[in-house]
């Protein structure tokens, strides 16, 4: 649709891996599947968190539904890498299944919003830093253009004269 692939948003992919790893741990704690499967899933998730396998997330960022495509993409990438880490071939889902194991005890309506919330919670620190940099840039432009007089505008009409610097400082 947009031509923009999910792989261009590594923080979203990493958050998905964190959610899948936490769910796998909970499933083992509840006896849903074995520690061997958990080890494979954790290994795959750690690789994703470390920035690997992101090239396998080629879905468009805009998609129908409530994130089902993204959730299943994550499940399949994690399951296939987990299989390799466990000594099996990709697609040998009897050992680690994308739906039954990686997505075990979850739905898209659990995993997708949780991963997006996690991404926002983890990303806010960087956002604050970038906002502070933007504020500093506006202040610098405000000083640079403080002597350039221009007509102010309000309600699509001319208003009180102001400097271009004052306009930048308003941001």
Predicted feature locations:
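Conserved, well-structured ligand/cofactor-binding cores
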Residues: 1-171
């Amino acid at each position: 649709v947009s031509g923009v692939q999910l792989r261009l948003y590594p923080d979203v992919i990493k958050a998905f891996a964190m959610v899948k790893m936490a769910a796998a741990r909970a499933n083992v704690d509840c006896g849903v599947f074995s520690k061997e499967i958990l080890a494979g899933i954790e290994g795959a998730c750690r690789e994703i968190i470390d920035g690997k396998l992101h090239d396998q997330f080629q879905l468009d960022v805009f998609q129908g539904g409530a994130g089902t495509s993204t959730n299943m993409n994550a499940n399949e990438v994690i399951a296939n890498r987990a299989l390799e880490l466990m000594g099996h071939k990709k697609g040998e889902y009897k050992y680690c299944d994308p739906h039954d194991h990686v997505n075990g005890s979850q739905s898209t309506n659990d995993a997708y919003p949780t991963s997006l919330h996690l991404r926002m919670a983890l990303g806010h620190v960087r956002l604050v830093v970038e906002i502070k940099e933007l504020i500093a840039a506006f202040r610098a432009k405000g000083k640079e253009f403080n002597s350039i007089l221009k007509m102010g505008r309000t309600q699509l009409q001319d208003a009180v004269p102001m400097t271009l610097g004052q306009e930048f400082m308003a941001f």
